[in-house]
A protein has these predicted regions:
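Compositionally biased, intrinsically disordered low-complexity segments enriched
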Residues: 52, 202-205
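Cationic, low-complexity basic patches in intrinsically disordered or flexible, solvent-exposed regions
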Residues: 192, 200-203
Length: 205
């Protein structure tokens, strides 16, 4: 309960409403044009705040009230559209700002970035640009973080959608290259923690 949540690239995510009373303050961070759309549909008040800035702009942290509380940073659906330099910049800002932070970051494998096209973004100019093989490889890029573990998107699909599971609980989807290469979730342990959608990586400082 005594935790601040920072949801980077929040879009129209509504978890902040479903998890009320389980955090001290919740900050949704996204680009100004995205926040304008969010404001049309979702009114923020109480412990929920909007910050219309890029996660690579360190000044976004100046708009937060922070007094050393535990922090959970959620980064979903973003890293695969950035350059490696941008990803490292984003994580560096988190590391330097918060004392006790857990980061959940969604990542994609380089294979998926190179060979898979996402139908949901075909009409836009967005494209996959960066991926990392696994959480341990990500940890090597951000040595201030300690690797804790990772979870594949397919594992979650097993529980949510029975059709993806075999008779003995094995994932049929995992045998298909497209799904087998989907983003994993990784955990790290150091002052900061980071996690992602496809792969969740947890980093702690």
């Amino acid at each position: 309960p005594n935790t601040i949540v920072v949801n980077i690239a929040s879009g129209l995510d509504t978890r902040c409403y479903r998890m009320q009373e389980k955090y001290v303050r919740w900050y949704n961070v996204d680009l100004p044009e995205t926040m304008k759309i969010r404001e049309k549909f979702l009114t923020e008040n109480g412990p929920v705040y909007q910050i219309a800035k890029s996660a690579m702009d360190a000044s976004y942290t100046n708009e937060m009230e922070y007094g050393g509380e535990n922090v959970l940073v959620i980064i979903e659906g973003l890293s695969m559209y950035l350059s490696e330099a941008d990803v490292l910049q984003m994580l560096s800002i988190i590391e330097k700002t918060f004392q006790n932070v857990t980061v959940m970051i969604e990542t994609m494998s380089p294979f998926v970035v190179k060979h898979i096209k996402e139908k949901s973004i075909e009409g836009s100019h967005a494209k996959f640009t960066w991926g990392v093989k696994n959480g341990k490889n990500l940890q090597r890029l951000v040595p201030a973080f300690t690797y804790k573990g990772e979870v594949s998107l397919v594992e979650g699909m097993k529980k949510m959608i029975p059709i993806y599971c075999g008779k003995e609980g094995s994932s049929e989807a995992g045998r298909i290259p497209y799904y087998a290469g989907r983003r994993p979730r990784t955990k790290f342990d150091f002052k900061c923690v980071c996690s992602t959608k496809t792969k969740q990586v947890e980093l702690r400082i």
